[in-house]
Regions:
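A structural "flexibility-hinge" signal
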Residues: 1-197
Length: 197
């Protein structure tokens, strides 16, 4: 049975809070622990939402499976301490975040910055660490399963909505950004997809 992404969000946050993991992340990105924890709790659902939007587009599922392939079957959460201690822990994550969020990357960083109190640049570093964690978990979910486009799109789409429901701050932030985009007549499908609109 595939594991719920909502459970994955909770599990990531639980493991981050274990031992000195949160301290390691905070030192790595140069932010305070409270702000980093807040940024992660909002950033992870937003990354899942972007994955949902990506898989719904032509070629999007192939892009996600390609990212999963780059992980080589590894899951940072299997040994979080070792992953965080690696000097390259966020290197691959930066390209993942850029590919997933695209033009929405800066608005999302700014929105999380306002909520968490961290500078946007620090939020970007937090997302770069979070992305491999999320991708590793998605890969783990499909271990031994047939990962076709329909299955990937359906699972991530449904579970990204559940992840948003588990994070009111992220959901409110996304709704505010959707409203802002609609007002300026530049709305994309990114946030609409998250809320099934």
């Amino acid at each position: 049975m595939l594991q719920s992404i909502m459970d994955i969000v909770a599990d990531i946050m639980k493991q981050v809070a274990t031992g000195d993991n949160l301290s390691q992340i905070s030192k790595s990105v140069g932010g305070d622990e409270k702000g980093v924890q807040s940024a992660l709790s909002m950033g992870i659902p937003m990354l899942l939402g972007s994955m949902s939007d990506t898989t719904s587009k032509p070629g999007g599922a192939d892009m996600i499976t390609g990212m999963l392939g780059q992980m080589g079957g590894s899951n940072p959460m299997d040994n979080l301490g070792s992953f965080l201690g690696s000097p390259t822990s966020s290197t691959g994550g930066s390209s993942m975040v850029s590919s997933l969020l695209g033009s929405q990357m800066v608005p999302i960083q700014n929105a999380i910055s306002q909520k968490s109190g961290l500078p946007p640049a620090i939020v970007g570093k937090v997302l770069a660490i979070a992305a491999p964690m999320v991708m590793g978990y998605v890969g783990k979910m499909f271990a031994g399963q047939k990962m076709d486009q329909k299955g990937l799109t359906s699972l991530i789409g449904d579970q990204s909505k559940m992840a948003m429901q588990s994070s009111p701050d992220a959901a409110n932030m996304a709704k505010q950004m959707l409203g802002s985009q609609q007002e300026t007549a530049k709305a994309t499908g990114f946030f609409k997809k998250i809320f099934g609109k």
